[in-house]
Amino acid sequence: METKIQELRKANKISQAELADEMGVTRQTIISLEKGRYNASLELAFKIARCFRKTIEEVFIFEED
């Protein structure tokens, strides 16, 4: 799944490690989310969206097959 996490994180001057700490996940999880190798749980998706004051749809781009 494509995300705008990296774009939002950089715009807000937040490191991967800082975001990971705030979300309660590892830095590797944030890296995997940014590269589209991992799909966030619903809970994590809400937390990330809330962190950036965005809706889930603004952060995570869902593409139907």
What are these regions (language model features)?
Residues T3-E22:
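Short basic helix-loop element that most often maps to the first helix and adjoining turn
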Residues V25-Y38:
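Recognition helix of helix-turn-helix/homeodomain-like DNA-binding domains
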Residues L19, R53-D65:
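Short C-terminal boundary/hinge segments that cap the last helix of small helical domains
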Residues A45-A49, V59:
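Hydrophobic micro-packing sites on short alpha-helices
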Residues K10, Y38-N39:
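Short amphipathic helical patch at the helix-1/turn junction of helix-turn-helix
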Residues L8, L42-E43, I56:
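Short, Lys/Arg-enriched C-terminal cap helix and immediately downstream tail that follows
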